[in-house]
Amino acid sequence: MANSNLSKAKNAKNDEFYTQYQDIEKEIMAYLDFDPNTFKGKTILLPCDDPEWSNFTKFFAQNFERFGLKKLISTSYAPESKLYKNNYQPTLFETNNPQFDEKKTIKNGKIFTLDRDKTGDGKIDVNDLEWTYLKGDGDFKSAEIKKLRDEADIIITNPPFSLFRDFLAWIVEANKKFVIVGSKNAITYKE
């Protein structure tokens, strides 16, 4: 069954596979066991995530203070730009926000940032995430996302399966530290 789903996804160019929270936690905690200051004072970029659904965004926002992060940046890819189209529906989080734009929600990616206690409750966490629409669709190869890549100290994500090699080259080009959590089969993927 799982192979059938992956084969269908490959043929349809559906790269929407969300990484489980516990898999992210297990991987990241291994880095912290080795060096508790791995993320201290660092800007983390999550460039291949839908921040409203991503467990990467949730995990790092919930652990922002614990890890001593400087800044968290999470970006998404616009629904209209995806090769695999599904019946996109904005979340209540987005539609209830004053900046919601019916056209931008499908044409533009989103950027979520976290770097301060926006709510004034004395802690920095998921409730302090701020968001806006990107100028473009959120493609990691765009100048807009490259600028964020260059700002980041560490890039962490589960990149689109079909773009794994391009994504890895994109990181290496900028000489950035990175953590890729995903299938070991991604490295062998060919069109």
Task: Go through each PLM region and give its residues.
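Class I S-adenosyl-L-methionine-dependent methyltransferase catalytic core
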Residues: 1-191
